[in-house]
């Protein structure tokens, strides 16, 4: 029981992140542009939390998967986790494309360009696959080797962002270019977001290694607070100092637009908050939200964007709501999405019985 409780705050983080993602998508898509005023402190606070949601979500995804993978040393257990991870990665990729597939276009014999856009599900699926590959290459043989390479991937992906952020990859097949470049319409790309997932994998191994130490949580919270501060407020000056020391011009660009490392600082602060609240976020409903983020995400996509049939709220209320309407609407929207997810999960046994009867051997 004690071992399981140490994961409660991770599920709580995932619950918070998916709720923030849902309300962010709702308000961003339906709020009238005339109310998007950066001179308004309330709007700026909302904008800040919207900005940290994706980094937190990607980090938590890498953290929980790696934690469960390395939790036991038994070979059969790990093989089971790896198989489950591969299936989930494939499921995420498939769902990512299905949610963007336009049925009306298919009836016309067309596949619209937006059907190939890469979104958050694609990126998490690829991130899980990369973590699995990293496990087979290094993790099977070296615990700390895996951790070191994982955090190095994060640092490299973030530092070299100025070199790939504006790539168009026009010579690539459009299907593949969407994974690297936003030039043709993708919402997310593998890089730099992979860096947050591998950083989560790194944190998972630290958690597993040191969680049994005396005063682990107070020390971990302090480290996250200090680390977050350094990343948010000191990392730009650090990159400038390194650039001047070794004369590496790239670091000037990193320091000028240092959002990736600064968001990583935000991630550490969120971790610190939830570790501090670990004994207060153990309600079964909170944990259930964190454990069912995929179904919640899919349901919200269908309700808000209409997904494959293009008949969602976005079609009727696109950028037309007042702040009061957007805020109250987002509360209702999040509540309905979560409740429908719970209904879907609770009907699993019933659905399994129906399918088993349909496909039962006569």
Question: Can you name each region flagged by the protein language model?
Answer:
Residues 1-362:
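Alpha-helical transmembrane segments and their immediate juxtamembrane cytosolic regions
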């Amino acid at each position: 029981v004690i071992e399981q409780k140490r994961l409660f705050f991770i599920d709580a983080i995932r619950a918070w992140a998916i709720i923030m993602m849902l309300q962010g998508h709702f308000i961003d898509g339906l709020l009238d542009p005339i109310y998007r005023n950066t001179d308004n402190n309330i709007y700026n606070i909302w904008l800040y939390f919207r900005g940290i949601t994706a980094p937190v979500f990607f980090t938590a995804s890498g953290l929980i998967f790696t934690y469960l993978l390395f939790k036991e040393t038994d070979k059969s257990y790990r093989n089971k986790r790896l198989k489950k991870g591969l299936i989930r990665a494939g499921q995420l990729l498939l769902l990512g494309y299905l949610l963007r597939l336009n049925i009306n276009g298919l009836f016309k014999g067309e596949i619209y360009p937006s059907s190939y856009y890469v979104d958050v599900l694609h990126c998490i699926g690829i991130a899980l696959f990369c973590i699995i590959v990293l496990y087979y290459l290094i993790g099977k043989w070296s615990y700390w080797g895996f951790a070191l390479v994982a955090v190095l991937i994060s640092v490299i992906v973030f530092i070299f962002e100025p070199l790939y952020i504006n790539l168009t990859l026009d010579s690539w097949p459009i299907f593949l270019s969407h994974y690297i470049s936003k030039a043709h319409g993708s919402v997310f790309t593998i890089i730099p977001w992979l860096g947050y997932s591998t950083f989560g994998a790194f944190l998972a191994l630290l958690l597993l290694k040191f969680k049994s130490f005396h005063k682990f949580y107070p020390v971990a919270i302090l480290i996250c607070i200090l680390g977050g501060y350094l990343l948010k407020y000191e990392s730009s000056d650090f990159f400038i100092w390194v650039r001047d020391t070794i004369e590496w011009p790239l670091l000037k660009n990193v320091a000028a637009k240092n959002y990736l490392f600064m968001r990583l600082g935000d991630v550490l602060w969120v971790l610190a908050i939830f570790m501090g609240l670990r004994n207060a976020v153990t309600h079964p409903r909170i944990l259930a939200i964190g454990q069912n983020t995929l179904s919640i995400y899919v349901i919200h996509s269908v309700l808000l964007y209409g997904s494959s049939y293009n008949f969602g709220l976005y079609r009727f209320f696109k950028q037309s709501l007042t702040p009061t309407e957007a805020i109250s609407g987002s509360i209702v929207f999040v509540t309905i999405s979560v409740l429908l997810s719970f209904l879907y999960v609770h009907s699993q046994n019933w659905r399994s019985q129906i399918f088993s009867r349909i496909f039962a051997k006569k």
